[in-house]
Amino acid sequence: SKANYVTNGQLFQTIIQRERNFEYEGEDVEVALHVPEEIINRLEQAAIKLKADFVICEIGGTVGEYQNILFIEANRIMKYRDGRPTAHVHVGYLPTPPSIGEMKSKPVQNSVKQLVSSGIQPDFLIARAQGKIDERRKQTLAWTTNIPAENIVSAPNVASVYSVPSSFDKDGFTDQLLKHFDMPSKKKDLRKWNNLVSKINRVQKSDKTVNIAVVGKYFDSGDFKLSDVYVSVIEALKHG
């Protein structure tokens, strides 16, 4: 719905219109003040409208980019104002250069430092990598980022995106997230979900094929093919 999608253009248009309507009562309109407040307002309104217990806000891009700095500032304000129950989950990539064959944690360490310089200490770290992160690197990340080791979650490549929830749960993400919000950890029954994942995996391994054309503008970028640009459409076709 409209409440689930926010762009910079929408925010600026709303603020400019309010200023033109004298809703700020002559107060100077400042980007660093009023835009983050409007972001927070939209998140709160989405929760009210949808009667949500939790609101998940994805901030795209990379820490340090000018395009998302106002959203990060809004997150900082929410995290430290009025004791709001907010969790910041940072996703970082640990590359394994083929020439070295070793998983490197330095890029994630630097991205967390960049985030901390913006006023946010992450509560959780999703360690995205080709394979499962080992205990040694998890401890290194905990030491260098001030994120508890139990809050560092491994996110290796999986055959299907639907395998991700089970992978996170096995690494303790569910229990730690509930603990962060002072909520009791309930006994989980993931059998139905795991059965769905098994069915999807069987379909993907099937030798039967159906040709479906997806016409899109952004499949190519120079010499590279962008496999995830229309991922929502493609995943819907896979299990539709």
Range-by-range predicted roles:
Residues 1-240:
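Flexible phosphate-sensing "switch/lid" loops adjacent to ATP/NTP-binding sites
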